[in-house]
């Protein structure tokens, strides 16, 4: 819907083969089960991070997090349905999302908080909803991949729902922005990926209501007119 040409490759395609295709960006999709069962995908993510724009959803979010050194846990109660409320910490807006997963990121295992970028907070919260209450999108320092920001939080159980790498062109969410049928609140994330591939530094700075008033329609030819052909 944003004018991208998509080439689908098998889940276990080595990173060098994918990169040899010369894509403008790589999308790590959703998939079934435990991310611990797909180490080749984690290796592929690790080889791609920092080299070109990367976007992941659901299982893609988990393997991107693992590639950055984070731990994944099995949730006490998995998220399954089309009405999970998620707050975008960058805009303060709440999105109704579709989700279908039993595992999730343990954000505190990504690294230590960067206080000057986390509202002065030095200790992690177990419940990510504390960040939504404070209106802060906290940032941690990973061991190898620089700074990572928490961008989205589940308002039902306080689990992390999205991250953004500040020193690499990479972001991911735990839910399904493409859900069909399902809510459309998160369709803007595909526009964000197109903007990232176009070199937009503020690619996630999208206020859906304001952009629509300005004439941007997120799944129309307006988007495709600004997007280059991508693999």
Set out the residue ranges of the language-model regions.
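Short amphipathic alpha-helix with an adjacent loop that forms part of the alpha/beta core around
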Residues: 15-22
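Hydrophobic, well-ordered secondary-structure elements that form the walls
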Residues: 86, 163, 173, 193
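Short FAD-binding loop at a beta-strand-to-alpha-helix junction that anchors the flavin cofactor
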Residues: 169-175
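Cysteine-nucleophile active-site neighborhood
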Residues: 25, 30-113, 183-184, 189-192
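Short helix-loop-beta junction
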Residues: 1-8
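Catalytic beta-strand/loop cores that center a nucleophilic Ser/Cys/Thr
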Residues: 92-167, 214-221, 227-231
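Acyltransferase
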Residues: 175-231
């Amino acid at each position: 819907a944003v004018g991208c040409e998509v080439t689908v490759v098998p889940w276990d395609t080595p990173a060098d083969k994918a990169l040899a295709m010369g894509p403008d960006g790589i999308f790590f999709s959703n998939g079934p089960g435990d991310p611990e069962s797909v180490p080749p995908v984690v290796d592929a993510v690790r080889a791609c991070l920092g080299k070109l724009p990367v976007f992941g959803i659901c299982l893609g979010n988990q393997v991107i997090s693992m590639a950055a050194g984070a731990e994944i846990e099995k949730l006490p109660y998995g998220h399954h349905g089309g009405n999970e409320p998620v707050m975008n910490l960058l805009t303060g807006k709440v999105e109704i999302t579709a989700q279908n997963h039993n595992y999730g990121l343990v954000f505190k295992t990504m690294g230590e908080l960067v206080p000057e970028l986390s509202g002065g907070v030095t200790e992690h919260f177990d419940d990510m909803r504390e960040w939504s209450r404070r209106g802060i999108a906290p940032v941690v320092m990973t061991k190898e991949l620089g700074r990572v920001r928490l961008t989205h939080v589940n308002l039902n159980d306080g689990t992390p729902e999205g991250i953004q790498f500040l020193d690499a062109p990479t972001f991911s969410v735990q839910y399904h922005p493409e859900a069909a049928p399902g809510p459309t609140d998160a369709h803007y994330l595909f526009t964000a990926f197109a903007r990232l591939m176009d070199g937009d530094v503020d690619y996630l700075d999208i206020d859906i209501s304001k952009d629509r008033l300005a004439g941007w329609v997120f799944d129309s030819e307006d988007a495709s007119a600004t997007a280059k052909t991508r693999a």
